[in-house]
Curated annotation (Swiss-Prot):
Transmembrane stretches, start-end: none
Protein name: Putative ankyrin repeat protein FPV243
Ranges of the ANK repeats in the UniProt entry: 25-54
Originating species: Fowlpox virus (strain NVSL)
Name of a matching Pfam family: PRANC
Alphabetically ordered keywords of this record: ANK repeat
UniProt superkingdom: Viruses
Length: 262
């Protein structure tokens, strides 16, 4: 599994391949890619929720064993191994920040402890911690009663309703471009939030134009209130509103044509 064939991996994932499927040796595509130092495949699998804390047939963290093997066989890690480490460590950190219970998982603890025990890897881990702290202090919106919205919220996809309302602020992409280790994760989260922004505003538009029986009640609400209400819906519900509103308009148009003909 090499960088030159990463588009095949992407094709298979798009058509429903299991990103965590194991071969006869108990290894998943992610760890095959790590063993072959395929940066493109590693990024692809992690973006598609590959389990970075997967264990091998002995019940130990596969990630730790791969890096430990490379450390012993090469008397340290070379530049390619460190490039892979700079990809996986941020994902490992985010998993621990999003889910506190993960910190008690045996494989996660093995991975973290190993990365902190090797100087080359510890430097990357420390760099990632400093970048996390900068994100915590990068305020995107100040709130009256505290709980300011920061780049850290985008990293962890917290306070999604407020993020949707400010996602078009050019400051966000500017601050994202200044990141190093977490840039890819934050950039993908921004794309997700922008997509949700489009769905929310699309749902609002079709309600205003096509849901005739609710238009009067909906239109008297301030725009901010309407958006806040729609923020409580998930993407499937927003898609349903959009599609059903268009279908409702189509049926109403057909009825009017029928009335004219009669």
């Amino acid at each position: 599994m090499f960088d030159r064939t990463w588009h095949i991996s992407r094709f298979l994932l798009e058509y429903g391949a299991d990103v965590n499927i194991k071969n006869r040796y108990g290894s998943t595509p992610l760890f095959e890619a790590i063993c072959n130092c395929s940066c493109k495949n590693v990024k692809l699998f992690l973006e598609n929720n590959a389990d970075i804390n997967e264990v091998d047939l002995d019940g130990d963290a596969t990630l730790m064993k791969i890096f430990n093997y490379n450390c012993r066989i090469h008397s340290g890690l070379n530049s390619v191994h460190l490039r892979i480490a700079r990809i996986v460590i941020p994902y490992l950190k985010v998993i621990g920040l999003k889910n506190k219970h993960v910190k008690n998982v045996h494989a996660y603890k093995q991975n973290i402890n190993f990365f902190n025990s090797v100087k080359q890897l510890r430097l990357i881990s420390d760099e990632s911690d400093r970048e996390i702290n900068r994100m915590k202090n990068t305020i995107l919106r100040k709130n009256k009663f505290g709980n300011d919205i920061t780049m850290y919220d985008i990293l962890l996809e917290k306070n999604m309703n407020q993020l949707v309302q400010i996602i078009k602020n050019p400051l966000i992409k500017k601050r994202c471009s200044e990141l190093i280790l977490f840039k890819r994760i934050v950039k993908n989260n921004i794309i997700y939030i922008e997509n949700r922004y489009q769905k929310i505003h699309g749902a609002n538009t079709v309600i205003e134009f096509y849901q005739y029986e609710y238009t009067d009640k909906w239109m008297i609400l301030p725009q901010e209130i309407k958006i806040n209400i729609l923020c409580y819906l998930d993407n499937k519900e927003l898609d349903y509103i959009y599609e059903s509103s268009l279908e409702n308009n189509k049926n109403n148009t057909s009825d009017k044509k029928y009335d004219v003909c009669c």
